[in-house]
Amino acid sequence: MNGGDVTVAGSDDLKSPLLPVVHNDEPFERQTVGQQLRTIFTPKNCYIALGPLLCAVVCLCVDLGGDETTTARNMLGVLVWMFAWWLTEAVPMPITSMTPLFLFPLFGISAADDVANSYMDDVISLVLGSFILALAVEHYNIHRRLALNITLVFCVEPLNAPLLLLGICATTAFVSMWMHNVAAAVMMMPVATGILQRLPSSSSTTEVVHPAVGKFSRAVVLGVIYSAAVGGMSTLTGTGVNLILVGMWKSYFPEADPISFSQWFFFGFPLALCIFVVLWCVLCVMYCPKGAGQALSPYLHKSHLRRELDLLGPMNFAEKMVLAVFGGLVVLWMTRNITDDIPGWGRIFAGRAGDGTVSVMMATLLFIIPSNIKKGEKLMDWNKCKKLPWNIVLLLGAGFAIADGVRTSGLAEVLSKGLVFLETAPYWAIAPTVCLIAATITEFTSNNATTTLLVPLLIEIAKNMGIHPLLLMVPGAIGAQFAFLLPTGTPSNVVGFTTGHIEIKDMIKTGLPLKIAGTIFLSILMPTLGAYVFASMGGV
């Protein structure tokens, strides 16, 4: 075995070892001191050491103003440690997300039970149930069937390139409303690139390719990644940022009413719709020149799409039941808490049932309802759930733990003093400023990390200004989702960039006007529609 001999002890040999002994005859090559040092001092190991080293520097050298701020200083050191590992990816992101479970108790920030509670609450339940439903949709190819049907509707004759682009983008945005935007981008990108595979490229053919063909390809890929981001803004389940915001609101203001799914939808959907319209217009102006439909029509025809749809066959019982469960979930989410005058079904349970309750309950049905494909088989089994994105679940838990630690340690109050200049500015100037700050930071860090860092500070600023905290929390969280300029901004951007159809200059050219438009719409809608939607949330 591996070039060695295996000696097995006889049953009557009491001096022989109980386990087999492997004799490896391969010579052991001793490393020199230089080789050993090169093995130890690799860039990744240096990045690993950077986290605790920076933490030690903060804890030993930083003075936040008195002995009573010791816990806040420790919290700052732990934050620096975690963000160093997140930025350098020295340690896998899910593992870094679990470090609060041991760092917070060891540094005297929070008790172990309190930290662990952050990793499993109603918001996490909402995410888990949604992810299981999304896996069911993906398993039965419902997303592909939906995309092909909608694209068929918009693929008119003669071909209208802007209209076809609208169909692809609208489908992606709709899918992203009901599942995580990264999952939506991952699921929709193969559908989009499948359509683009019919188009010729200058590298694969000797024929002269019309410039509109390449431009339309860029428009489709950009449309998918940006539509996934924009669509995710409209619902709580569309992106982790919205869930982090809800969790922080619940943590900082436990006596206030929680942000419900329907409440966020009434604000998030109009905002997302406005940004989506701008996205489509920008893509049409930049990438759909006159004559694009005529150039694309030889390669894109309804018959091609119908052929792919025919390959999927008619909808079977399992697909219909998954859609029924998904539809029931959306209805229950929207009707749990409607208005003060129309209480919704949540009143029956005295407010004890949350959106996570519904999410897990409907996901459980998938393991009970038969699929009618094989005898005894259910719509879902646990083997199909092995692709659950636990990294996102752990990241959300870390965000909630950090938010709670920043609050209880007093770090938020200390850091907010550095932004005291904002307290004297009018709200109409603060909202876009906060949004732009978040939108800038999120290009270089994950949107979840940006939200986790900024929102606690914005809460303290809002308290000092005497305004409703959500008037600053929402612009900070939404701004963190405007990662439109760089491939590294979000995983969705990476998905699009790796297709080879777009370059960084395409993202900057398209993303910059989108970022500006999003900031303007948010600055207008938050003090108007947002004030109306969130007005009933007292206890602040």
From Swiss-Prot:
Keyword Membrane: yes
Induction (record text): Induced by malate and by acidification of the cytoplasm.
GO term, biological process aspect, one: malate transport
Keyword annotations: Membrane, Transmembrane, Transmembrane helix, Transport, Vacuole
InterPro entries: SLC13A/DASS (IPR001898)
GO molecular function annotation: malate transmembrane transporter activity
Main location: membrane
Cellular localisation: Vacuole membrane
Summary of the tissues where the protein is detected: Expressed in leaves, stems and flowers.
Transmembrane stretches, start-end: 46-66, 75-95, 123-143, 164-184, 219-239, 265-285, 311-331, 353-373, 392-412, 419-439, 466-486, 520-540
A GO-annotated cellular component: vacuole
Pfam families tied to this protein: Na_sulph_symp
Record's bilayer topology term: Multi-pass membrane protein
Name of the protein this chain belongs to: Tonoplast dicarboxylate transporter
Species for this entry: Arabidopsis thaliana
